[in-house]
Amino acid sequence: YDGNKNNKSNQTYAYLTRFLSQKGFYVISIQHELADDPLLAMEGNFMETRMPNWERGVANILFTIQEFKKLKPQLNWNDFILIGHSNGGDMTMLFATRYPQLINKAISMDHRRMIMPRTRNPRLYTLRGCDYDADSGVLPTEKEQEQFRMKVVKLDGITHSNMGENGTE
């Protein structure tokens, strides 16, 4: 894990932002981890050790939404989709838990730690790589997926890292 120490970390998801922009989406990309930030905790109870990072991420997302609503009031803010990969996916699920009224859909790309809220709104999706399992209780059961209209999509042959800078459309 090199986290934010990679000097190209701000380009990691350029393929995804380009793809979504070409499909007509207005894309806002947030670089959460800065070069002088401490690395994420790699041991302990992640729901405790990583929570400060996730909470800061949620605050960053909330601030960004509030500011862009002022800058771009003409956008359809009722159709807001939040997407995050890995740690960003954990932030996405925490944001969906805390501010469900602000987003229409939340999509995680192989997050592993933050429990997906069991709710019908916002609509929740998670794309799962083939190489790592999520922690126990993070993902909804098949019954919960049906009950809450959640979707877990397993991607055969796609690894956790393939969803980042090595990913393709």
Range-by-range predicted roles:
Residues 1-75:
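Serine-hydrolase catalytic machinery in alpha/beta-hydrolase-like enzymes
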Residues 133-139:
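Conserved alpha/beta-hydrolase "acid-adjacent" motif
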